[in-house]
């Protein structure tokens, strides 16, 4: 079922991206140009469908990279010849144990450095991150964005995030009890007091 509020928010993304305050960080003070589009995890398919449309239209006017974080994890493991072994291990030990085992090979700094190695970040108008739902819990949004601060330079970053973002706390998927502090801009807030590009 289509979520009408989410559909409206999705329809606003392109115009927000085209604004100078996104592309040039105008009006954001000295804060880094990191943006989050949060959405209900159960609406993942609705977001994916809109992304196909959005990317086609953005390609007409912008040079950008759209990166699937889950695919990045797979690529990193494949480069080290670990992917097949990791798949077998997940079946044996479960996701939580696997996460602990991969804390070294897949720490957030290594993921950020891998992205910087694969993409000329300075040459992009902006970078879009998707696939956070599939990558969780191996990758946490607030930890990855913190690590990316060291490699993004002045290039704006937009993360599509299945969960909720209050302007200060990221709660993954439907886990409202888990609140992880991170300061970024909410690209298209809900209606009401939070309906501003810059969080209060």
Swiss-Prot record:
Consequence of gene disruption: No methylation of 5'-GGTAAG-3' in chromosomal DNA, BREX no longer confers phage resistance.
Q: Which GO terms describe its biological process?
A: defense response to virus
The record's section on InterPro entries has: BrxB
The induction annotation reads: Transcribed at slowly increasing levels as cells progress from lag to exponential to stationary phase.
What keywords does the record list, in alphabetical order? Answer: Antiviral defense
Of which family is this protein a member?
A: Belongs to the BrxB family.
What the protein does?
BREX systems (bacteriophage exclusion) provide immunity against bacteriophage. Part of a type 1 BREX system which protects against dsDNA phage. This system allows phage adsorption but prevents phage DNA replication, without degradation of the phage DNA. Methylation of bacterial DNA by PglX guides self/non-self discrimination.
Q: What is this protein called?
A: BREX protein BrxB
Q: Provide the species name.
A: Escherichia coli O9:H4 (strain HS)
Gene for this protein? brxB
